[in-house]
Regions:
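Active-site environment of divalent metal-dependent phosphoester hydrolases
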Residues: 57-58, 79-81, 104-110, 134-137, ...
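Binuclear metal-ion centers of metallo-dependent hydrolases, dominated by the metallo-beta-lactamase
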Residues: 126, 134-198, 262, 267-304
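Active-site-proximal beta-strand/loop segments in catalytic clefts of secreted hydrolases
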Residues: 50-52, 74-77, 101-105, 130-132, ...
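Core dinuclear metal-dependent hydrolase active-site scaffold
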Residues: 36-94, 162-236, 301-304
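Bacterial N-terminal signal peptides
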Residues: 17-32
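Active-site metal-binding motif and surrounding structural segment of the metallo-beta-lactamase
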Residues: 67-70, 79-133, 230-247, 259-263
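Stable alpha-helical elements in mature extracytoplasmic
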Residues: 81-88, 108-112, 146-153, 215, ...
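N-terminal secretory signal peptides that target proteins for export/translocation
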Residues: 1-11
Length: 304
């Protein structure tokens, strides 16, 4: 046996393996890092506002549809708008991953109650809402509250495991989005307002990597001021859903502080003629923001 020849053969083989291993290490070292969340980091979300300018009544209904197929619904409007809400959800795939009810007033939760009671081909995975104290609400209820709607809502939620009650200080992540909650029902709410249902509206921020939107339900002016004093810059967002359909006086400082590029106002034609709403629309524009409402040619934005 030629030992020298055999040695050279093994040496050549070893050198080849070493070179290959070195190339592999260099490739791993020089290749761009891929974050663990790469699967959701590239997802974009289209937020769309719905509403009939000639309906003669206010309502609130939004969808947030992800490029990954996930769907989030916010409120939905009146019970007699059920067919439209149902058709909209069906057009987006019929599967609702999160249905968020800002507060159980008829112009926000009516359609949801009907669909949840009889879903048909619509699948609802989770429901998020504020847990309002029944006795406190009953004590301070107003005629516009339509209290039986709240009772219907609570009866439905008492019989399901899909409900997840949320309030101030809660947060979670969903498919790359971050949800932060700043308001909900609180036992100290009547120190700020005795309008229990509106005052308990979920105020939450939905954030992507670069843009965000703040939803405020129907909070009143005093609640908005308290939130700014408590959460400060955490509330600042790219987009805003105007509180209480753009209504109520004393909102200027709130709109100025949030500093949204685009503000959605859920107000049909008749409501936009109300002095407080008209003034708020003027103020938003004077502050440099755009207003999207039921007559706008564009009624959607992208969170990414």
């Amino acid at each position: 046996m030629d030992l020298k020849k055999n040695y050279n053969k093994h040496l050549t083989c070893f050198a080849g393996l070493a070179a290959g291993f070195l190339i592999l290490l260099l490739a791993l070292f020089l290749s761009p890092a891929v974050p663990c969340s790469a699967g959701t980091a590239s997802v974009s979300w289209r937020v769309t506002q719905y509403g009939d300018d000639h309906a003669g009544k206010q309502s609130m209904f939004y969808t947030i549809k992800g490029s990954n197929g996930r769907l989030i619904v916010i409120d939905g409007g009146w019970a007699d708008q059920e067919a439209f809400v149902r058709k909209t959800i069906q057009s987006l795939g019929s599967k609702v991953d999160l249905w968020i009810i800002t507060h159980p007033h008829p112009d926000h939760a009516g359609a949801f109650i009907k669909i949840f009671s009889s879903p048909g081909d619509i699948r609802i995975r989770k429901v998020i809402a504020p847990k309002i104290n029944d006795s406190r609400y009953r004590k301070y209820k107003h005629s516009w509250d339509e209290y039986p709607v709240f009772q219907q809502f609570m009866k439905l939620m008492s019989g399901t495991s899909k409900i997840h009650w949320k309030g101030a200080g809660d947060s979670f992540r969903f498919s790359g989005l971050k949800f932060q909650f700043f308001n909900g029902y609180s036992s100290t709410l009547n120190n700020t307002t005795k309008d229990i249902c509106n005052g308990s509206s979920l105020v939450f921020k939905v954030s992507g990597r670069k843009t965000s939107m703040l939803f405020t339900g129907d909070i009143l002016t005093k609640v908005g001021r308290r939130l700014i004093n408590t959460y400060k810059k955490q509330l600042k967002s790219t987009y805003l859903q105007a509180p209480h359909h753009g209504n109520n006086t004393g909102r200027y400082s709130f709109y100025k502080y949030i500093g949204a590029d685009i503000t959605f106002v859920d107000a049909p034609a008749f409501l936009r003629t109300y002095p407080a709403v008209a003034r708020n629309l003027q103020n938003i524009k004077a502050l440099g923001g755009q207003v999207y409402t039921y007559t706008s040619s564009r009624r959607s934005v992208i969170i990414y």
